[in-house]
Amino acid sequence: MLSALLALPAATWATAGPEGADGGARLSICYNYGCASEGSVHVRGPTLRRIGERLAAARNAAEERERLAGAVGGLYRVAATQTAVAADRAGNLLDGGADGRMDCIDHSTSTTRLLQLLEARGALRFHRVVEPARRTRLILQHFSAVIEVLSVAERIDRLPPGQALAGCNCTEDGLVIGGIGEADGDDRPGQRYVVDSWFVDNGEPAVVLPLAEWLNGGGPNVQ
């Protein structure tokens, strides 16, 4: 089911509806476990612009991930004003069968859609959105949205026209684009991280972890 849901084109998930005149976007959020229910959510243009401005202030991939965790939480708060997902709590046991509860399929599907919306709006400069990941422990399995660190060349490609040259420090060694080639600590192009909103209550920042750590069981101890 998850692969079928994610096979839909991004435009199906994040297109401007009748209210799109404000620069906003409309997308579907899954809930009630296994994407049994879906609710249409309109994110206003000013909200998307504020999120974009905050993400644009990130100086490297690590800072973008930190800001992205909060952005995902904020978008779920928006969804909570228009759908039943305000009832969602961390994990599954605390949901108590409430309408609006979300399991990991709901979260991985919906969070991927939220991330793709931000990516389509040019808000991600250091990462791309990739397919969700699955981990299996004994008879249990768990899914999460995933992002991947971009190379410097790919980051430059994402700059608006003219911005790369405007920020260029031209030297004999080549081009250094301000804010694009800064050191990212241990980050390497292609490195993957989960953005897992299942671990938290509705509206709280998502948990962002290296994919390898998550696959090994990393993350808060919730059920």
For the regions a language model picked out, list residue spans one by one.
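Bacterial N-terminal signal peptides
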Residues: 1-9
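Second-shell loop/turn segments in exported
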Residues: 37-38, 54-65, 93-106
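Glycine-rich, aromatic-bearing surface loops/beta-hairpins
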Residues: 215-223
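Mid-length scaffold segments of soluble, non-membrane domains
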Residues: 70-127
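Extracellular secreted precursors and ectodomains with disulfide-bonded cysteine-rich loops/domains
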Residues: 28, 33, 102, 166-168
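Extracellular/mature segments of secreted proteins
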Residues: 38-45, 112-115, 177-178
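Hydrophobic/aromatic-rich core segments of domains that either
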Residues: 116-206, 212
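N-terminal accessory/pre-domain segments preceding catalytic cores
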Residues: 12-61
